[in-house]
């Protein structure tokens, strides 16, 4: 994957809240994902999502490394293939003891024909099938690629936000997702494992290590590399955080 140093400065991943088999895995391929340009609302384009629901046994923590594995080995190659057709995209990570459970989502803005191709490629990926067979992934959900239900750039932003924030946020979270994926890529590049012969279990073990290293980078460098520079973009103005107090980074 190409370095994301050309992305808008100050983009940061905030609030990341974000199994066994024996099938061989296809060799990894590097990807090259270009940054977004400004996108106008378009009646022939809209938002779609492909969602992976993980196996999450009771009394165990979420397997966050599964998000990392799927993002890097399933979604990233598709992003590379269709980057000229995808205007904006992002990842969404969540885990709660409800019907969705631990769910990793790839959300993207494109036209109907491209949505169909992108959705089909992800759903029909050999690794997707292996993860389902192994029981690591319970279900893969996707929206009807023939129907645009969320046409505006702001259509998937939080409706409680002011309109300007709704319209700007998709660019922010696009950059956040790219930065996180680049961290994953850089971590993988340092070790360069021979993944072609890995079983599903071995691949999961490897991405558990990758995910841990990415989390450590966030824990040790996130305050300055991400939060401080994000605060700088806004002129070091204070911000109301969850605890309802002002902070600067």
Label every model-predicted segment.
Residues 2-3, 15-249:
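An acidic, charge-biased composition feature
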Residues 1-11:
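Bacterial N-terminal signal peptides that target proteins for export
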């Amino acid at each position: 994957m190409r370095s994301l140093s050309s992305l808008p400065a100050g983009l940061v991943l905030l609030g990341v809240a974000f199994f066994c088999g024996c099938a061989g895995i296809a060799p990894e391929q590097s990807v090259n994902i270009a940054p977004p340009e400004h996108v106008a609302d378009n009646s022939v384009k809209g938002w779609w999502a492909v969602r992976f629901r993980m196996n999450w046994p009771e009394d165990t923590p979420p397997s966050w490394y599964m998000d990392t594995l799927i993002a890097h080995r399933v979604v990233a190659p598709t992003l590379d293939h269709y980057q000229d057709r995808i205007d904006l995209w992002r990842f969404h990570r969540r885990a709660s003891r409800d019907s969705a459970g631990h769910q990793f989502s790839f959300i993207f803005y494109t036209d109907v024909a491209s949505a169909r191709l992108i959705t089909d490629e992800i759903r029909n990926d050999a690794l997707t099938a292996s993860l389902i067979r192994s029981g690591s992934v319970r279900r893969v959900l996707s929206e009807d690629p023939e129907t645009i239900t969320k046409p505006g750039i702001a259509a998937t932003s939080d409706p409680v936000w002011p309109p300007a924030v709704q319209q700007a946020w998709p660019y922010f979270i696009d950059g956040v997702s790219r930065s996180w994926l680049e961290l994953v890529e850089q971590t993988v590049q340092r070790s360069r494992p021979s993944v072609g012969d890995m079983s599903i279990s071995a691949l999961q073990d490897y991405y558990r290590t990758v995910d841990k290293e990415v989390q450590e980078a966030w824990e040790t460098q996130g305050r300055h590399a991400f939060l401080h520079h994000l605060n700088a973009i806004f002129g070091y103005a204070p911000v109301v955080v969850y605890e309802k107090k002002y902070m600067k980074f």
